[in-house]
Amino acid sequence: MVDWTDPERSAIVGLWGKISVDEIGPQALARLLIVSPWTQRHFSTFGNLSTPAAIMGNPAVAKHGKTVMHGLDRAVQNLDDIKNTYTALSVMHSEKLHVDPDNFRLLADCITVCVAAKLGPAVFSADTQEAFQKFLAVVVSALGRQYH
């Protein structure tokens, strides 16, 4: 269990209320697939991922990006129990999908970049970034929990 300070909790929940999950999710997943092309192997059913433009315009990428962000919403709603909230997802990603757990960190970095670019430094201050990155690190840890 993570001990969140009141300012961290406030920063995470406040920032989350400003994030458009339907905008940031597709951007972040597309960025991951472009910047870390080896991650594309997990998305072979998504169709054309051959160029950055194809990835950015791919409806399956957009849909899954939204799914990822809605999954993060579950973590925001369960800040005190993120590990248990993500148990089933961790099992699925490790045992069924065989996703390298480091890919979760890479996606978290892409989410951070997209949020910062969208909201700017007035909203995404250093203190807010610190709390958000701590939150994402806890999510990444929870997703990697079932790996051996």
Swiss-Prot record:
InterPro entries according to UniProt: Globin, Globin-like_sf, Globin/Proto, Hemoglobin_b, Hemoglobin_oxygen_transport
GO biological process: hydrogen peroxide catabolic process
Keywords assigned by UniProt, alphabetized: Heme, Iron, Metal-binding, Oxygen transport, Transport
PROSITE patterns recorded: GLOBIN (PS01033)
GO cellular component: blood microparticle; haptoglobin-hemoglobin complex; hemoglobin complex
Annotated ranges, domain Globin: 3-148
Pfam families: Globin
Function: Involved in oxygen transport from gills to the various peripheral tissues.
Name of the protein in question: Hemoglobin subunit beta-4
Source organism per UniProt: Oncorhynchus mykiss
Lineage, top ranks: Eukaryota, Metazoa, Chordata, Craniata, Vertebrata
